[in-house]
Amino acid sequence: MTDVDIKIENIVASATLGKSIDLQTVAEALENVDFNREQFPGLVYKLKEPKTAALIFGSGKLVCTGAKSIEDSKRAIKLTVDMMRTMDPDIPEEFEIKIQNIVASANLGKPLNLEAVALGLENTEYEPEQFPGLVYRLDDPKVVLLLFGSGKVVCTGAKSAEDAKLGVEKTKARLAELDLI
């Protein structure tokens, strides 16, 4: 299979603490927090290192976004929970962190004729009047690729970096098979 370099642009991960959280208390105790219940039901806690944002909800659910690696994503959630535990010692030590979405980019190295790609590949959507990219859905791995005429690609929906890379590599191989690249 054709080897392609991918760059992870964003990882979204979540955790459920199994306990409700008093957002007002958290907002008052932490720095770098945006909290306005009328605009958004949770609070946004911005970490400097790793540079991420944690969305904290009253239900005890956390969502971390902005990490460039799975390790940073997990570290950001753990740091956020540790910070919250200083205010509420009943927050559990053990909780599961789930990777929800990985967004990665790649360059196929050659321009693409998106009209020809739309005709050649199945499971595509291409409406240039609406969006300049072609949407290509794969079943294995279950990812969505946005292909652009420049040859640049954005992969979304991956649960691992390996799935993102595999999705891009399979797509490049299929395009080569059809003489579209």
Swiss-Prot record:
Annotated GO molecular function terms are: DNA binding; DNA-binding transcription factor activity
Alphabetically list the UniProt keywords.
DNA-binding, Repeat, Transcription, Transcription regulation
Could you tell me which residues the sequence repeats occupy?
Answer: 8-84, 99-175
Note the Gene3D superfamilies from the entry. TATA-Binding Protein (3.30.310.10)
| Highest taxon of source | Archaea
Disulfide bridge partners, by residue number: none
Keyword Transcription belongs to the record: yes
Matching entries from HAMAP family are given as:
TATA_bind_prot_arch (MF_00408)
Its function, per the record, reads: General factor that plays a role in the activation of archaeal genes transcribed by RNA polymerase. Binds specifically to the TATA box promoter element which lies close to the position of transcription initiation.
Q: Which family does it belong to?
A: Belongs to the TBP family.
- Name by which UniProt lists this protein: TATA-box-binding protein
- Organism of this sequence: Methanothermobacter thermautotrophicus (strain ATCC 29096 / DSM 1053 / JCM 10044 / NBRC 100330 / Delta H) (Methanobacterium thermoautotrophicum)
Q: What is the lineage of its organism?
A: Archaea, Methanobacteriati, Methanobacteriota, Methanomada group, Methanobacteria
Which gene holds the coding sequence for this protein? tbp
